[in-house]
Amino acid sequence: MKILQNSDIPIYKQISSQLREQILNGIINEGDYLPSIRGLARDLKISVITTMKAYEELVDEGLVSAVHGKGYIVN
């Protein structure tokens, strides 16, 4: 996943867009868990809050669900 720090598109939107594309194209399948929020934030060198905002956008769209204590799973 690539993040453009100087883009006009907010970082959380860049993340949610790339994950959405991967889900809709079958790269990430139904039943798969997304990377942990902390792990993705660490890997991308961004804040946990930014990653959480991206994941919550996908929840709002119905693409993923939050599973308490486990993470985010693709619907």
What does each model-identified segment do?
Residues 27-32, 60-69, 75:
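Beta-hairpin "wing" of winged helix-turn-helix
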Residues 33-65:
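N-terminal helix-turn-helix
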Residues 38, 73-74:
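Positions that flank functional sites
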